[in-house]
Amino acid sequence: MGLKRPWLLGAVVLLTLIQVQGGLAEWTQCRMGFSKEKYSFLVPKNLETDKALGRVIFNSCEGPVRIQFASKDPNFEIHKDGTVYIKNPAKMKDNRKTFRVLAWETKGHVYSTNITLKREGHRHRQDLFSGKHSHHPKSETGLKRQKRDWVIPPIIVSENEKGPFPKRIVQIKSSYAKEVKVYYSITGQGADTPPEGVFAIGREDGWLNVTRPLDREAIDNYVLFSHAVSSNGANVEDPMEIIIKVQDQNDNDPVFTQSVFEGSVPEGSKPGTAVMTVSATDADDSVDMYNGVITYSILNQEPKEPTNKMFTIHSESGLISVLTTGLDREKNPVYTLTIQAADGEFGKDRTTTATALIVVMDTNDNPPVFDPTQYTAKVPENEVGYEVARLTVTDEDIEGTDAWNAVYKIIKGNEANYFSIQTDTGNIGLLKTVKGLDYELKKQYILSVIVTNKANFSVPLQTSTATVTVSVEDVNEAPIFLPPVKEVSVSEDLPSGQVVATYTAQDPDKEQNQKITYVIGNDPAGWVSVNKDNGIVTGNGNLDRESKFVLNNTYKVIILAADSGSPSATGTGTLVLNLLDVNDNGPFLEPQQESFCQKDPGFRVFTIIDRDLSPNTYPYKAELTGESNENWTAIVTGQSILELRPKKELEIGQYDVMITLLDSFGLSNVTKLHITICQCDGDKMQCEEKAAIAGGLGISAIVGILGGILALLLLLLLLLLFVRRKKVVKEPLLPPEDETRDNVFSYDEEGGGEEDQDFDLSQLHRGLDARPDVIRNDVAPVLAAPQYRPRPANPDEIGNFIDENLNAADNDPTAPPYDSLLVFDYEGSGSEAASLSSLNSPNSDLDQDYSALNDWGPRFTKLADMYGGDED
């Protein structure tokens, strides 16, 4: 865009006719570098060492220049003249192989090109040199000439060119054009492959044209192949490679990789400390031109304290670092920088900006300070873990960090380690007692406490100190027994009232002059007493070393000492009695039950036990008394073993053997042994059944008895259930007809007792079956009688049975008075019971008024005639 005149100059050069004389291309433009960006060599399948493949040409444009070549593929090497040789033997597995070649010139610039090896069989005009010392072919004098490939440098076309289009770039012309009519065409990217139609060539004149503006950022190189054919389509020349390189124009702004960059730096950092790196990209060319070279700078800094240039940025790398001292988080915790990225040779062409946020990290540059620095406290004596004071500090560093967390230490006044100080979650120092203070020992403590941080100071700082004055308060302390545990030795036969020990306590509160009273705190056996005034402990006369309350010959008694303070305080002392043994327990035998066989019984061993201690134990003597001496022999063997054996064969049964044992001092004790003689021989004991009969029932017998009892109870229960089932008979809802009875009750008795049910059963009616015939005149019913449901077998259907039959009876058209005319004045034959007519009512029949019967209708006419008419 801004290189209009250079384009015109380049156009003049590029439009210079390139004559291809005998296949040798001529050009006037020179550009340092390889003559081609790609070389193609035709090679056999097997690559042998020291074989020359071809030569790459480097254009220095400035006369002889020392060039060094190198191959990126270790199987090939490049000599100084550009000849490519095979270094290691290999095989061409594929039809082509590509590797890269580099060239360095004296100024340090590096150039590169690609070499493609093609297997034989592909159409190519490149010669293959036969040996390492082969020479390149040269033109000979005379008419004969040697042809070689078309070689032209890349054609440079600037991007973003203005029209009119198409624009001519270069003209291609074959040397055979004088002999035959030559037609030109191009193929490749930008011609017949996407993007198609960017380049076009005159079919007859060979002018290569560009048809539209180019964009280097889209495609920076186009590789085309020009073709020259005759009118019959035959190739006049081999296809020639044309490389069109798009020259960059500065048409793209730099772009930062982030809109906002974030970094951090510790406060107090020295100049040169790296903070962060910003980066930007530019789509323009930064290799051959300065269009894509980016230069960084700082446009603005906020806040501008302590100076407006606290940071600097490297113009090429974008590294931001500290420029000067004075970073202080407490004053300026964040800096905002406006960063500019500019391209061009002097960094003044296209620009863009971004923001860099730099957080100043806190360091421990502020000490914690006590507020206040003086503390006073009162602490009761003997209190452990008592909170003495809560020390507070202020710190300007960030709360919750190691630079803010306080660490307290007592540096003076705590030589006896009575106090400790810890930091709580609120950064407060909690001063507590770790041991009980003693008012009588020391009444006041003055402590010096310093405070630091968990993190070390980043700069030299002075620590803060606080003073804590602790006053000890006097409290009523319990009396103290000295020693706390006192041991005395007493004989277990100590007489009652005998002094065991004097066990007293001292009152720490000497200034209060209090009286101490002693009592027994714990005496499980009740063996001692204590004088409440002087602490003298006496025995109660019943000490026993062999008691269950004695453990390892010792007996413990707790003594309490209470002072007269208000409230009273009580101290505790332990009196340990070591009981001395006396010979008060006679020896006895274990076990006290044993069995012998009737035949060849042998002997049994018993253990002699004596609860006393030596020398009140062995040696022992054994004596059999009464009948036991006639049947048994007892011998003491060893210290505590007794052997017992029968003197003769005894009858089967139980025997009680009385043995008297005497210890070394003659203290005796009689043991009764229960011996069973069993029907067996020697050691084959068979005493189970006998022992069970003699000593009680065995387990199997007990189980059998219990099983029999349980079976009997079960049988009894089944019998009761059977009887109950037989008795419970479900009564029908209606009684049978043959059980219907009439009863005559006398209601004029108002008395009680049993007379109301004392009546003559013989006076009852004999029953409906024995009644005399009733005089009746039957009239045949006009309608059919209803069908009554028979009595169901299931008792649950009785209710339905009654309801249905009752309904049928209520609607029976054959029921009286429709079906019969009954004569009611016939009372039947004589009855064993008295006639009711003998019972006269207060008024006779003559006094009764039956005229109302006439109002009952024709159905009751006969009845009205009988009672309301004449005597006739």
UniProtKB/Swiss-Prot annotation:
Keywords: Calcium, Cell adhesion, Cell junction, Cell membrane, Cleavage on pair of basic residues, Cytoplasm, Endosome, Glycoprotein, Golgi apparatus, Membrane, Metal-binding, Repeat, Signal, Transmembrane, Transmembrane helix. Residues 1-25 form the signal peptide. Ca(2+) 2 binds at D251. GO terms for cellular component: adherens junction; catenin complex; cytoplasm; desmosome; endosome; Golgi apparatus. Gene3D superfamilies: Cadherins, TCF3-CBD (Catenin binding domain). Glycans are attached at N209, N456, N552, N631, N669. Residues 747-758 have a biased composition (Acidic residues). SUPFAM superfamilies: Cadherin-like (SSF49313). Residues 723-872 are cytoplasmic. Residues 148-256, 257-370, 371-481, 482-589, 605-688 form the Cadherin domain. Residues 739-758 are annotated as: Disordered. Ca(2+) 3 binds at D282. Residues 149-701 are extracellular. One of its GO terms (biological process) is calcium-dependent cell-cell adhesion via plasma membrane cell adhesion molecules. The chain crosses the membrane at residues 702-722. Abundantly expressed in intestine, stomach, liver, kidney, skin and eye. Also expressed in heart, lung, testis, ovary, muscle and brain. One of its GO terms (molecular function) is cadherin binding. Ca(2+) 1 binds at D251. Three calcium ions are usually bound at the interface of each cadherin domain and strengthen the connections, imparting a strong curvature to the full-length ectodomain. Homodimer. PANTHER family: CADHERIN-1, CADHERIN-23. This is Cadherin-1. It comes from Xenopus laevis (African clawed frog). The gene is cdh1.
